[in-house]
Amino acid sequence: MTAILVTGYKSFELGLFSDKDPRIKVIKAAIQKDMVKMIEEGVDWFILTGNLGFEYWALEVLKDLKKAYPISVATIFAFENHGENWNESNLEKLAAFKTVDFVKYSYPQYENPSQFKSYHEFLMANTEGAYLFYDSENETNLKYLVMKMKELPQYRIHYLTFDRLNEIYEEGNDF
């Protein structure tokens, strides 16, 4: 079994506020290409954390890929009350994260910052690598997790970058 943590930018961090934004199709095309390659290399578990944006788009791609490949998807939320204040549209997306093969919560609710450290350590200890949509030139809070991942010599990180998205777009696929 090979498990990969999937995480990256949230939609608002990318300035994507509509599900109909054409850039999302390019992102999903890149996700699909990358994930098929990972599956062919032996990845059979994809671990999500329930965030909107990249993770949700990855979830949509994974649900399609499950029809053709023997893969499993897990959502491991940091807190049971994750997303409880989201609007109705986002709550529907949250519900989709709860329809995967395995769902777990690390903590009932947020109490202190050390919970995030323990949560991230757990995610890294239970995955062999990560698939990240992240660029160090466009930092977010994800930078702390990325720094910890880089400290682990055997932890493989596959990045989806803005340059890669441009390549996918220029390939001229029908989006």
From Swiss-Prot:
SUPFAM superfamilies: MCP/YpsA-like (SSF102405). InterPro entries: YspA (IPR010697). Disulfide bonds: none annotated. It holds the Pfam family YpsA. PANTHER family: UPF0398 PROTEIN SPR0331, UPF0398 PROTEIN YPSA. Belongs to the UPF0398 family. NCBIfam families: PRK13660.1. This is UPF0398 protein SUB1405. It comes from Streptococcus uberis (strain ATCC BAA-854 / 0140J).
